[in-house]
Amino acid sequence: MPMTVVSGRFSTALLPTCFSLSRLHSVKYAAQRRVVFVSRSAHASSASVSVETNSNSNVDFVIEKKDKNRGEKKILACPICYNSLAWISQPNGLIESAASGIQVQCNTCKRSYSGNETHLDLAVASGSKRYSEPMPLSTELFRTPLVSFLYERGWRQNFIWGGFPGPEKEFEMAKAYLKPVLGGNIIDASCGSGMFSRLFTRSDLFSLVIALDYSENMLRQCYELLNKEENFPNKEKLVLVRADIARLPFLSGSVDAVHAGAALHCWPSPSSAVAEISRVLRPGGVFVATTFIYDGPFSFIPFLKNLRQEIMRYSGSHIFLNERELEDICKACGLVNFTRVRNGPFIMLSATKPS
């Protein structure tokens, strides 16, 4: 059996009782290409912004040494009461076989959570024998085995028709926003099959990468795709967690960065999700997301605005949000310095937690 992604490094990487940041030294990351793009505020024109790459240039990213006073830090929390978790079962200290032996318990409400072969399940309803909580269609679609299997086998590639420049270019663009928090931890929220989780892990720009999704089948695909890649670098820094985006199992102010690739339009409540992201981000932490927005006439024709609301209510999709609404959500949730890049329906946005 191949080594599980959720491996023995749980005891040194996530540590429900004590999260120890890696001792990082200054390194240079030489990117193979430089992404040139224009970042504008939402108050600027909504015209499309072109995204170019220059394969002849390099971008240097320097990871600064972390403050010694931040050497130990809690991160995992109970999704019910948001208090810290403690080990119940931690087989042999370092878990080298499967996550199924992991069991943690909330120090306050005493609710326990466990892991399976592929991931640690920290959803509120995890372990329920009879209760099943249905989600909106846009969420349930990605919980199906078929869509989870197809996501990196043709599904995601079709996003190019919506203006998405492709995972590699999107990763390069995101790094520019994430530069202030390099060397810290990052949550790849709604990670799907782990496309960006693997890119973040392989880059070695972060001390810990948490691949988080609500779909069990997506996390299984993430696990399988990772373990198919022989000698995948920095595997010990990647952890798979199942959780609800609107109920993140992390302590307040414990996370350096949150990335959400092509996900925001599928969240049942974008405002609830961004509020949670704002809660877990530390001061100065960065939120970066990409999504589709088909604003156009839906943003200014009254009849179509009402139709938009009905479509979103029944489908659970939020593709008809506009730029100003996305900025409003971020501001309402306590995030500042909203910027964005557009290319047709594609938008990459970034906002930060005030320092």
From Swiss-Prot:
Signal peptide: none annotated. Its EC number is 2.1.1.-. It is found in: Plastid, Chloroplast, Plastoglobule. Residues 1-49 form a transit peptide. GO terms for molecular function: S-adenosylmethionine-dependent methyltransferase activity. Pfam families: Methyltransf_11. One of its GO terms (cellular component) is chloroplast. InterPro entries: Methyltransf_11 (IPR013216), SAM-dependent_MTases_sf (IPR029063). Keywords: Chloroplast, Methyltransferase, Plastid, Transferase, Transit peptide. It is an enzyme of class 2 (transferase). GO terms for biological process: biosynthetic process; methylation. Belongs to the methyltransferase superfamily. This is Uncharacterized methyltransferase At1g78140, chloroplastic.
